[in-house]
């Protein structure tokens, strides 16, 4: 059975780039009747916050993602310690005592000599006495994973290709000799991303790892670690990344296009889903009405090689299309939460929906119709005409067709037509230059309110 995972770090509000990965995994699991695992990468105890864990759960629910299981890496430290000890005993995890400053100086020297800045495994040369001396100076070791890029002597590396058939990009190759042995454990004995991730993928029987192509190099290292643990390899698939229109990557620290902010601004969940999933693919970005329809057009192989640029203007356009197609029953509860209810609520929604881009913008038109207004939008030269229009307002209850009857009579009497006929009346009644059909607005306003607004001096 297909089993995928989404492993966010709860160190901030997740953004559109994060959620794209979540949606790719979720839709892939749905397409293959598999399972979707939510795994919080909360090994950074200081920066991980419960408020972000809660926010991620809310974001996923809003996007229609329902995890089959939830795990916390912070509750699995004993398991990571167990695996780390096995690797140490096998000589695959070795202690290093260089400081960050020493490593940086070494890197600069390598670059000045036009050499690749690869860690030289100097720590492997340390004797037991030298290690003891380092620790007596107060130095604590960080631990590196010994990459299998040598035959007998780890100080004599050779080209060692790790190959895999990527589910998105096809055959991929990483030369382990071109990489430094990765640090898996910091000086303070906390874990970096790699070891917990691989251990969890093994223990949780993850079959497919779908993520951004900035992880391709990591994959070479992780495959080596999977093999070191005698574990079965999952299928890897690397999709193109999302960037801003300026080509910058998204960041949780900058709160860039967080899902929370998009939701609070009033964007439709399905609009966010459609754009996040379809942008940067061979598929047209289409406003599918629900996730099931989006799933029918989802295919990992459709993603392009280049970075996809996410433009908020595209999201606004997509959102508009979707809102214009929403029926009253689709939004009834949300409108009620906006204090839009009553016997005219459905008629109101059908009248104004094609003139708004977000459901919450309906509040503006509800207030225009129901609240006391003091519009001053009519030009001075049109005010006499507005006053005159009262004499031609149809008798009785105003209906949709009343607008046509009214303006026809005014046109015949005054000679006005087009914009000079319609605009002053719209401005006097709504304070706006544009909006829903005036016939529908007349019915919503009612005769008494229409007369009151037209009578203002």
UniProtKB/Swiss-Prot annotation:
Motif 'HIGH' region: positions: 8-18
Leader peptide range in chain numbering: none
Annotated source species: Bartonella tribocorum (strain CIP 105476 / IBS 506)
Sites where the protein binds ATP: 252
A Pfam family reported for this protein in Swiss-Prot or TrEMBL: tRNA-synt_1c
Short sequence motif 'KMSKS' region: positions: 249-253
Molecular function terms from GO: ATP binding; glutamate-tRNA ligase activity; tRNA binding
PANTHER family hit by this protein: GLUTAMATE--TRNA LIGASE, GLUTAMATE--TRNA LIGASE, MITOCHONDRIAL-RELATED
Assigned protein family: Belongs to the class-I aminoacyl-tRNA synthetase family. Glutamate--tRNA ligase type 1 subfamily.
Entry protein name: Glutamate--tRNA ligase 2
UniProt keywords, alphabetically: Aminoacyl-tRNA synthetase, ATP-binding, Cytoplasm, Ligase, Nucleotide-binding, Protein biosynthesis
Aminoacyl-tRNA synthetase found in the keyword field: yes
């Amino acid at each position: 059975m297909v089993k995928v995972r989404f492993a966010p770090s709860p160190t901030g509000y997740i953004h559109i780039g994060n959620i794209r990965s979540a949606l790719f995994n979720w839709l892939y699991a749905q397409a293959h009747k598999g399972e979707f695992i939510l795994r919080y990468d909360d090994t950074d105890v200081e920066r991980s916050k419960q408020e972000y864990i809660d926010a991620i759960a809310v974001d996923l629910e809003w996007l229609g993602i329902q995890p089959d299981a939830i795990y916390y890496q912070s509750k699995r430290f004993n398991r990571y310690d167990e695996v780390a000890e096995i690797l140490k005993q096998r000589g695959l995890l070795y202690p290093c005592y260089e400081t960050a400053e020493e490593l940086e100086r070494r890197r600069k020297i390598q670059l000045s000599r036009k050499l690749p800045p690869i860690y030289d495994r100097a720590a492997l040369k340390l004797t037991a006495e030298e290690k003891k001396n380092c620790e007596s100076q107060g130095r604590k070791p960080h631990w590196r994973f010994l990459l299998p890029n040598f035959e007998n002597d780890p100080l004599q590396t050779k080209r060692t290709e790790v190959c895999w058939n990527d589910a998105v990009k096809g055959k991929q190759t990483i030369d382990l000799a071109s990489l430094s042995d990765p640090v898996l454990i910091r000086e303070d004995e906390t874990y970096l991303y790699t070891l917990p991730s691989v251990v969890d993928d093994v223990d949780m029987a993850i079959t497919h790892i779908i993520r951004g192509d900035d992880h391709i190099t990591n994959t070479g290292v992780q495959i080596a670690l999977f093999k070191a643990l005698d574990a079965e390899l999952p299928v890897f698939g690397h999709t193109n990344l999302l960037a801003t229109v300026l080509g910058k990557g998204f960041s949780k620290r900058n709160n860039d296009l967080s899902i929370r902010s998009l939701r609070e601004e009033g964007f439709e969940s399905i609009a966010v889903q459609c754009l996040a999933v379809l942008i940067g693919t061979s598929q047209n970005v289409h406003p599918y009405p629900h996730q099931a329809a989006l799933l029918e057009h989802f295919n990992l192989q459709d993603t392009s090689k280049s970075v996809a640029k996410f433009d908020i203007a595209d999201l606004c356009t997509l959102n508009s299309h979707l809102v214009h197609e929403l029926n009253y029953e689709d939004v009834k509860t949300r409108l009620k939460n906006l204090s839009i209810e009553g016997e005219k609520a459905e008629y109101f929604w059908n009248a104004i929906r094609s003139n708004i881009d977000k459901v919450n913008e309906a509040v503006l038109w509800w207030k225009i119709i129901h609240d006391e207004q003091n519009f001053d939008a009519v030009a001075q030269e049109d005010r006499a005409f507005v006053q005159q229009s009262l004499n031609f307002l149809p008798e009785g209850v105003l209906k949709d067709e009343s607008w046509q009857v009214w303006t026809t009579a005014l046109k015949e009497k005054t000679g006005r037509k087009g914009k000079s006929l319609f605009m002053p009346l719209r401005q006097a009644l709504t304070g706006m230059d544009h909006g829903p059909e005036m016939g529908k607005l007349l019915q919503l306003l009612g005769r008494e309110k229409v007369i009151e607004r037209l009578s203002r001096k």
